[in-house]
Amino acid sequence: VLLFDIDTLRADHMGCYGYGRNTTPVMDEIAKEGVRFDDYYCPNAPCLPSRASMISGQYGIHNGIVGHGGTAADMRLQGTTRSFTDDMSENGLFMQFRRAGMHTVSFSSFAERHSAWWFNSGFNECYNVGRRGSESAEMVTPHVLDWLERNGKKDNWMMHVHYWDPHTPYRTPADYPSQFADTPLPDDWIDEKTFEEHLLHIGPHCANEINMWNDDTFPQWPKHPGKLTTLEEAKHLLDLYDDGVK
């Protein structure tokens, strides 16, 4: 089993999901030979809550992780029923592959980036290039290929490969757009107006950083409206973190 975990990649911008430009030819070929989900929903969209749901099989409101800071970023404690190991490490997604007799390996810096060490539970091997999510695919893939060269012909392995390239910081190679110079833009192309609207909603991952608790200080981030005096101002502040706790 080869599982690609590509951070913040939109399905509707991939060829295998019908996007009009040839932006993901390699992944499209892999999709032809693998499993492609038509109806797969993310209950908690930010990076940390999303993977907590994927690993635990629970909504964030149940596993405890609904945000990126404070207690909202901590897995809920099991309590008095915990034995030598907790239920998360024994029953998480990757442990299911291991229980099935597969050798599990991960190439990811996610656990270090978010201090989410539970993410590594169930893996026989974990490889981290040490860039805390700032690495590009060129830094990860050589290690993946090396492992496959040494172990790929063996039976019963499960590999998790994590790429961060679509995530910030955006660093598309300068010559990349030239590949599509002769390809018409799709009808749903993200134009400058859409991008400007997106910038209005950019904020950090912690309520304290966006100055939510001090109405009298000039907001550091454009998303923060200062005082909330109308319903529309309140709607402007709502984001995916709120969705995770409703």
What are these regions (language model features)?
Residues 1-246:
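Catalytic domains that recognize anionic headgroups
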